[in-house]
């Protein structure tokens, strides 16, 4: 009987470990309008390239006026 409770406790501990490592919070993303991008933004890759030169992780086009917004982790 003592061996059975050790097995159950070990299984429970392993399940807790798996669930704890699976629940990782995602970092917040901050964004700022690009200061160097000129014209209308239609290409995410072009926007991202300009944002990289400004020190950001990436960028995307958004809004009715199609502006480039740079993104990074806060």
UniProtKB/Swiss-Prot annotation:
Which superkingdom does the taxonomy of this entry point to? Eukaryota
> Hey, what tissues is this thing expressed in?
Expressed in flowers and in young fruits.
What does the entry list under GO cellular component? extracellular region
Keyword check for Secreted: yes
CDD domains hit by this protein: Knot1 (cd00107)
Q: Which UniProt keywords apply?
A: Antimicrobial, Disulfide bond, Fungicide, Plant defense, Secreted, Signal
State the signal peptide span.
Answer: 1-27
InterPro entries named in the record? Defensin_plant, Scorpion_toxin-like, Scorpion_toxin-like_sf
Cystine pairings recorded for this chain: 30-74, 41-61, 47-68, 51-70
Q: Which Pfam families match?
A: Gamma-thionin
Keyword Secreted (UniProt): yes
The main location is: secreted
One of its GO biological process terms is: defense response to fungus
Where does this one sit in the cell? Secreted
Instruction: Name the job this protein performs.
Output: Plant defense peptide with antifungal activity against F.oxysporum and B.cinerea.
- Return the similarity comment: Belongs to the DEFL family.
The record describes its quaternary structure and partners as: Monomer.
Q: What is this protein called?
A: Defensin J1-2
């Amino acid at each position: 009987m003592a061996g059975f409770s050790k097995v159950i406790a070990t299984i429970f501990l392993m399940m807790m470990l798996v669930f704890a490592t699976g629940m990782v919070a995602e970092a917040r993303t901050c964004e700022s309008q690009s200061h160097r991008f000129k014209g209308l933004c239609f290409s995410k890759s072009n926007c991202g390239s300009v944002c990289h030169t400004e020190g950001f992780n990436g960028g995307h086009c958004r809004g009715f006026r199609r502006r480039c917004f740079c993104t990074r982790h806060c």
